[in-house]
Swiss-Prot record:
This is V-set and immunoglobulin domain-containing protein 10. It comes from Danio rerio (Zebrafish). The keyword Nucleus does not apply. It comes from the Eukaryota. Residues 21-411 are extracellular. Glycans are attached at residues 34-35, 46, 135, 147, 159, 211, 269, 280, 284, 330, 357, 376.
Amino acid sequence: MMITSAVVLYLLLLSHQTVSEEQVQQFVIGEKGNNTTLHCLDHPVNASSVLYQWKKDGAVVATQNPPNPSVHLSISENGFLRISGLQLIDEGLYECESQAKGGRSWQTLSKIQLTIAAGPTGVSLDISPATFLNNGTLFVHKGSNVNFSCSSESNPSQNLTWTVDNLASDNPEREFGSKSPLAFSITNIQPLDQGTYTCTSQNTLSRRTANKTQELLVYYAPERHPECSWELGDKPSDVLFICSWFGGYPVPTLTWQEVEGAAEGPTINLTTSQQTEELNVSVNRSILHDGDKVKCTGHHVTGVEKSCSFTLKIPYPTGQPLATALEGTNITISCTETSSLPPAKTVWKKNDDLIENTSKYIVQENRPALTLTIVNVTKADEGVYYCYSENPLGARELEVYLNVKTSAGNGGAIVGIFVSVLVMMIGIVVGVTVYTKRDRICIGLRFSQLDDDRVDVLSLVDSDEEEIFHEAVPRLPPVTNGHATTLVEIHRIPSCDHEDIADSTEQSDQTRANLTEAGPQRAELQPAV
């Protein structure tokens, strides 16, 4: 930066120089608005014997003892030129000339190049889009794109620099340049980008600096909704409503209020507001009613507004109202309470006595269920047990009656079960028997339904038994082939059709004749049964 300034200064001096560099004996830099004195370097030892005058760019601008003295330009007794309130027009090549009193010629004693430095002035910065707070601080929304711009006036030239002072940056410089305005931008700005931003302008000739600072904050609302909760207060008669909304900057404003009250009873009068991340309100339970609805609203300065709410509900435990246990066994009864707000405290009682964990009773809480196990049940354990639930709105209980049966009382049940199994087994055996002999049963039923009418039945009997009927049945004529004949038994079976008797006789005779011709068997007539 120093090298650049030196080069600019050198070029500037060249542009304003009217004589060669060898002729200039001194370079003087003055600041606009200040006073400066130019020395006449080679003035005589006896200054009182000479007269002085000063020229600027070849023109006389000041003389000693003028008739109308100038406040802006004046010459001292020793020939020094004093310039008050430097202006840009005062810049140029000044020559100090002297003349002996009574003389007629002027002698140039020294040549001085005066350069006027102005500024920097009018340093201004702009950060947008941003919003001013009452204290002058700017804030932007997290994730937005922010533009930074800085400008100033300076003669002959200037250097501009953007810096930021925050804890997240090791290098404070953000941007540097000689052009005005000097601008840069931050895309998707984050909380780490907040800090104090400074724009510094430095005159390249006088090294004079000027700056302007602006504190910038990055605001963001919590991403989640507020959370509403509750707990018992320090006093037994109080309940504490808790509203929390963490994760934003700056902290939000939280407000508790009653949205919808119960049909009867006084209102909660809960309206309370405070700028905090957690707002706790203590309410006396006497003014709380079933059905009251309360709401917590969180408002953030960025314009984000979110809320949470809940409706107060009295407890309502549920479960089976009847339980049966066998004497000498263990029994577990349970109840469930899920509807209460704030959540109720649930316990087991018997005869208004609180049941706690002992060798006889085992109480287990597996939300939302609360179980009671009675070990080694006896007849004395029979009775009513209460599942008692209570919250700030009130209390309710579920009655569970335990019926205990003794071992003697179960004898009849065991006998009944045995008889039932026996009857079932007999039925299975009878069914299987009937199924396996179904053909015989069906034939017997068929013959029992016939009338006294008769029909002829032809039965074939093995010829090996012919000796038995040899005397009782007339023998048929022998066959020439020498084989045994088949014995034919003809039975008379009742028939309802009397007209078919003659036909049956003819058919029998025909059958006998056919069998006689058959060969190796014989036909024998046997009286019908």
